[in-house]
């Protein structure tokens, strides 16, 4: 195991345009960090640079205190798990898991011992004599993880390993990866576009956007205090409702652009840096909009209602803004019904319209 450090890491492909704009992060020994963001944000490029599959244009990458910029992937003491498994079809599970050690000249007895140990961790014992074509998608991904485990690396790198699996298998594999990290405590960097994977697996999340690390923090902090409108809209399913408008001079109401006046008394409290009488982007998550007894509320004309099982999502519009409200299972408003909607001050977020950055 080892700490991983990125200092001012930039990437360009020969021109003036950078695809990574200076990433700075220190990942502690044994920490599980997830790089999350949409396609094209730079997360996979950054992972490939850590792995040594892409060169570093500027900055330094260090593993265990050793700068690895000039080292080949095989010399970085890393192991990588890919989206497409990358198993040899003519080899058995055991041979696939041990092949990386074999080509490095490791003794057969040690290879067998490590393969057996990894198979026990991943419950692959009964499958060791099978070939990849005889395995399910989830089993193949466990074999790919086993191949990484037998290396006993300082750092695990996961490149969207669950993308090829169906929804049920993704849930199962998330749990297995959590258990694996709890058992091995190996420094891990995991890339995904799926914010649910990021929230459930990470000790810290790095939200990537257009080559920048938009926010770095614990999943709960990123969810509860998004640093920008991008993070607010990307982390959370459904996304945070973001409303353009103006806070009244007394700070008690928010006038949605081309929409209704909303009661927000107490939202611009002392010390939050939220000036009344100016334009803001107001954010509120769908689960925080169900009114409690005695609360002031606005109303929303329901366009549709999604029945999700444990809860429901009502959808409507305020002006040009789509609005989603999460409701208890028993609340199922129909199209055209008027729904009372709360905007509790403690759950409101304000963002600067010019920069998209959080206030307060």
From Swiss-Prot:
Main location: membrane
UniProt entry tagged with the keyword Translocase: yes
Domain ABC transporter, first and last residues per copy: 4-235
Catalytic activity: sn-glycerol 3-phosphate(out) + ATP + H2O = sn-glycerol 3-phosphate(in) + ADP + phosphate + H(+)
SUPFAM superfamilies reported in the protein's UniProt record: MOP-like, P-loop containing nucleoside triphosphate hydrolases
Record-linked Pfam families: ABC_tran (PF00005), OB_MalK (PF17912)
GO cellular component, one term: ATP-binding cassette (ABC) transporter complex, substrate-binding subunit-containing
Localization (cell): Cell inner membrane
Domain of life of the organism encoding this protein: Bacteria
InterPro entries: AAA+_ATPase, ABC_transporter-like_ATP-bd, ABC_transporter-like_CS, ABC_transpr_MalK-like, ABC_transpr_MalK/UgpC-like, Mo/tungstate-bd_C_term_dom, NA-bd_OB-fold, OB_MalK-like
Cited function: Part of the ABC transporter complex UgpBAEC involved in sn-glycerol-3-phosphate (G3P) import. Responsible for energy coupling to the transport system.
Family: Belongs to the ABC transporter superfamily. sn-glycerol-3-phosphate importer (TC 3.A.1.1.3) family.
Name of this chain's protein: sn-glycerol-3-phosphate import ATP-binding protein UgpC
Protein source organism: Burkholderia mallei (strain ATCC 23344)
Phylogenetic lineage: Bacteria, Pseudomonadati, Pseudomonadota, Betaproteobacteria, Burkholderiales
